[in-house]
């Protein structure tokens, strides 16, 4: 496993872990049952993504990136409170920005993995890209129809 692949795997582990923290924070700041259910589903999916990247790194005996627990929790809490105080519309805007960042990163990684002939990894990356696109579309739709 080359250094660039290791860097990408760690980058995606961190990105997916951050998305999980962000979406979990939204669940705890809302009373809208449908909204919470959607974020619970996103947490489930993004956790699966993070677990996948963790497993690939662990299988290669590469140390996982570590996050200072309280600092990472604080970031999730801060983002949740900040967005909660500005409303669901802005929560969705921030979520869309996160999903767009993830989609851009996935597209780059998919291209890089094609060049390296990592076909099994590419298939998984494409599945995860679709998940990110679906999340972004849900957030956009919710933002449009639920002021």
Question: Locations of the language-model features?
Answer:
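Non-heme di-metal
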Residues: 1-147
